[in-house]
């Protein structure tokens, strides 16, 4: 089971947006408690991203850049 910290690190290490990211403490992760953590919503630099699990891999999609 992924912890919040390991999940945030995974997001940081795999995201393809700006690599000059904030420290881990400034990355806000919210897990939607669906079955087996299928959906993960997090914000980075005023952007909202949705992580969806797809065949045991997480892919990320930009939802909003407001």
UniProtKB/Swiss-Prot annotation:
Asked if the Swiss-Prot or TrEMBL record annotates the protein with the keyword Metal-binding, the reply is no
- Cell compartments where the protein resides: Host endoplasmic reticulum
Record flagged with keyword rRNA processing: no
Q: Where mainly located?
A: host cell
Q: Where is this region: Involved in the inhibition of host protein synthesis?
A: 13-34
Recorded GO cellular component terms are: host cell endoplasmic reticulum
Q: Which domain of life is it from?
A: Viruses
* Described purpose of this protein according to its UniProt entry: Inhibits host protein translation, probably through the EIF2AK2/EIF2S1 signaling pathway. Promotes cell retention in the G0/G1 phase.
Family statement drawn from the similarity comment of this UniProt entry:
Belongs to the asfivirus E66L family.
The protein's name is Host translation inhibitor E66L
């Amino acid at each position: 089971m992924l912890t919040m910290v390991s999940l945030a690190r995974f997001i940081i290490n795999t995201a393809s947006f700006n690599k000059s990211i904030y420290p881990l403490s400034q990355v806000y992760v919210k897990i939607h408690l669906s079955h087996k953590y299928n959906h993960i919503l997090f914000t980075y630099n005023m952007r909202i991203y949705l992580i969806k699990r797809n065949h045991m891999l997480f892919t990320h999609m930009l939802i909003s850049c407001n």
